């Protein structure tokens, strides 16, 4: 979007290529750490994404939240905060099929060697969790985003305050990726005086 430094708005195809190269760099870093580490290392990966949590603890709402978390948006300009696009290649050695179909015309050439490199085994999964979306099962059987009420708590930079995502996010991530989860970033911006 160009909102953050360096203020560049890259073409969509370039953003997918950048992401793919970042994942390849991650895989290469894992190889180098394993090859040259002087002791046994615990190596991880820490992307960031918006989590989803269920409106109620009904089985339907829980399944809807899980599905929403790992689904890819239809809008190709809104893929960057997605859990499965960044994490499935690392843990499963492949991009999500849903994303390959939705974003096909923007993707770089992806080789088997790329995916082997990207999926170098890791020991822990970090996730930067700041907020999330409340989800319920819609009447049509598809996940539905629950609209926030007027006056919903927000941080100083207008991020929603959603502590529920600190429970449900790691739970869903562990179910899918079967790797110890670390919350590597969390917090909220306030107008504090020290």
Residue ranges: model-predicted function:
Residues 1-194:
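Active-site region of glycoside hydrolase catalytic domains
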């Amino acid at each position: 979007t160009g909102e953050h430094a360096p203020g560049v708005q890259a073409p969509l195809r370039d953003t997918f290529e950048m992401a793919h190269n970042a994942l390849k760099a991650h895989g290469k870093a894992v190889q180098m750490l394993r090859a040259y580490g002087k002791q046994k290392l615990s190596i991880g990966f820490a992307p960031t994404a918006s989590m989803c949590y269920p409106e109620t603890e009904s089985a339907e709402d829980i399944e809807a939240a899980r599905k929403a978390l790992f689904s890819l948006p239809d809008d190709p300009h809104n893929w960057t905060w997605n859990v499965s696009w960044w994490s499935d290649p690392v843990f499963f050695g492949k991009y999500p099929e849903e994303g390959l179909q939705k974003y096909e015309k923007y993707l770089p050439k992806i080789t088997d060697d790329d995916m082997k490199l990207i999926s170098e085994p890791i020991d822990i999964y970090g996730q930067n969790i700041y907020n999330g979306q409340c989800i319920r099962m819609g009447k049509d059987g598809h996940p539905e985003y629950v609209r926030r009420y007027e006056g919903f708590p927000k941080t100083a930079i207008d991020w929603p305050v959603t502590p529920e995502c600190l429970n449900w996010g790691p739970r869903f991530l562990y179910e899918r990726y079967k790797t110890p989860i670390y919350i590597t970033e969390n917090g909220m911006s306030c107008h504090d005086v020290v």
